[in-house]
């Protein structure tokens, strides 16, 4: 193990030596200034989502958002991703090419809430949509279902306005339950996944989609 200037350990097997780590994080203040932009972008986005949630609750007597969780990529994750893509380890390159440094996962009550929130965000005039990947209408082969948006939104500081990219994942409670446990089974145990387990995981994903459909149907009956 090696340690960079910020006391963060970077595994040697990830291909980063001390020099490479410190080229990106050579100055603590510069790093903090850059990451402040991403932290503030998360706050700005969460505020917009909370406003939409409260407005919807007032109009429909329920909340479309069950929970939100935000995160910033760790320095080692950022550097490893840049190295895998053959990018120079500097801040301008990082900011221009790594679009998922800041991320928000939004867990919604129903599938229709996912698309409602996505539309509301896309309709906001100062938000730029960088990418949109609809894995709900077109699930991944393993059954994964979620709507991914990469957006760029303005963050207003005392003397400047900066447009910062944020990755948003919107999914239902049922999908989040499946995705969390699937990730644990597939990656945390560090064991090979055979065809039988793959099939069962896919069946569980299909079941979670069936639950979503049934619960949404019941919602419409009751409303």
Regions found by a protein language model. Give the residues of each.
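An acidic, glycine-/histidine-flanked metal-binding catalytic module
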Residues: 2-42, 46-55, 166-223
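Generic alpha-helical secondary structure
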Residues: 34, 38, 42, 75, ...
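Long beta-strand-rich cores associated with HINT superfamily self-processing modules
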Residues: 95, 108-215
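Terminal, regulation- and interaction-focused segments at domain boundaries
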Residues: 102-107
